[in-house]
């Protein structure tokens, strides 16, 4: 499937493109503010920040930041709707085209690791979704529960289970569908060997000392509560939010709904759970990011070195 127009490939819109990734709380947004907004625009690669109404819990770039440097793929979907990796590729391709037409360079920035890999290589050759199989898998999950679904995935496709977060039921369900439909694990269907359209991005990975990252995650979660995360959740509930909404599977939201299912709403307990989940997720992110080839790992505290790396790439 092609997600990009002929004009994009012929105009060399992928001649310069930058990937900027790292775990949650590492400091990606602060770095973006040091870039020249006349030369760069940002394409968001966070699977929760694509949703409207999910601002504080997703640590979405503030309106001030978005007004400082142009951002794409923020607030493009309602939280009750699915947003697939194929959707991301389609949106990101169009954003790249627009950015290059403006004479700028796109920076794809975020923490959803598989967005980067699939944007670079495209989708795997896994069989397409089948309505009957999907209904069968959905019925089993409805009967046995989400924890059972992830245990089942761990049995039939441990490689995918290592890559997929247990609460990401869209991807868990999809992996189970592929297994039921083909008898083969999703992980056995490989990505194309070559990048799409001859893409050769500058790939910058941001990494910090683990103790410092843990501290930053803790401060970030405190800031979320101080900025009104609980009020944001109450606003979603007034909208009729349900725990099954795809946008609410993200860390910072699912913990509230899990607490309510147990008849509890303790700020301290929920905050602790969000922090634990965030730390665990950061470790999983780094594991995935380290599988990426040709990553230039850099300390976000050394902004000048990063900006120099970007400048040299843009002049190449």
Q: Can you say where each PLM-predicted feature lies in the sequence?
A:
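Phosphate/pyrophosphate-binding catalytic cores of soluble transferases and nucleic-acid-acting enzymes
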Residues: 1-316
């Amino acid at each position: 499937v092609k997600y990009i127009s002929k004009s994009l490939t012929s105009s060399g819109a992928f001649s310069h493109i930058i990937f900027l990734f790292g775990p949650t709380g590492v400091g990606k947004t602060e770095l973006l503010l040091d870039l020249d907004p006349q030369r760069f625009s940002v394409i968001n690669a966070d699977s929760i920040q694509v949703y409207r109404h999910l601002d504080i819990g997703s640590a979405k770039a503030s309106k001030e930041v978005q007004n400082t440097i142009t951002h794409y793929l923020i607030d493009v979907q309602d939280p009750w709707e699915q947003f697939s990796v194929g959707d991301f590729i389609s949106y990101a391709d169009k954003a790249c085209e627009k950015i290059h037409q403006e004479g700028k360079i796109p920076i794809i920035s975020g923490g959803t690791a598989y967005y980067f890999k699939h944007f670079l290589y495209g989708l795997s050759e896994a069989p397409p979704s089948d309505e009957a199989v999907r209904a069968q898998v959905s019925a089993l999950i409805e009967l046995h529960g989400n924890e059972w679904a992830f245990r089942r995935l761990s049995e039939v496709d441990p490689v995918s289970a290592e890559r997929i977060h247990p609460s990401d039921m869209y991807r868990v369900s999809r992996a189970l569908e592929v297994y039921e439909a083909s008898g083969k694990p999703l992980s056995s269907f490989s990505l194309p060997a070559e990048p799409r359209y001859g893409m050769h991005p500058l790939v910058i990975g941001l990494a910090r000392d683990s103790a410092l990252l843990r501290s930053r995650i803790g401060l970030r979660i405190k800031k979320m509560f101080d900025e009104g995360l609980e009020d944001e959740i109450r606003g979603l509930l007034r909208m009729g939010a349900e725990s099954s909404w795809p946008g609410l599977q993200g860390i910072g939201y699912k913990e509230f709904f899990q607490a309510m299912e147990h008849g509890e709403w303790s700020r301290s307990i929920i905050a602790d759970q969000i922090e634990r989940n965030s730390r665990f997720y950061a470790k999983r992110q780094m594991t995935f990011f380290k599988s990426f080839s040709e990553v230039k790992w850099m300390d976000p505290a050394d902004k000048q070195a990063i900006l120099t790396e970007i400048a040299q790439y843009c002049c190449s």
